[in-house]
């Protein structure tokens, strides 16, 4: 899931983890 992708803004990180 959103590994790595933490490079994006916190706002997008939340969507990444949710969509993960």
UniProtKB/Swiss-Prot annotation:
EC number(s) reported in the record: 3.4.23.-
GO BP terms in the entry: proteolysis
Key words of the record: Aspartyl protease, Glycoprotein, Hydrolase, Protease, Secreted
PTM summary: N-glycosylated.
Subcellular location: Secreted, Extracellular space
UniProt entry tagged with the keyword Chaperone: no
Enzyme class of the recorded protein, top EC level: hydrolase
GO cellular component terms given for this protein: extracellular region
Tissues of expression: Expressed in chorionic epithelium (trophectoderm).
Main location group: secreted
MF GO annotations: aspartic-type endopeptidase activity
Family listed: Belongs to the peptidase A1 family.
Protein name in UniProt: Pregnancy-associated glycoprotein 61C
Lineage: Eukaryota, Metazoa, Chordata, Craniata, Vertebrata
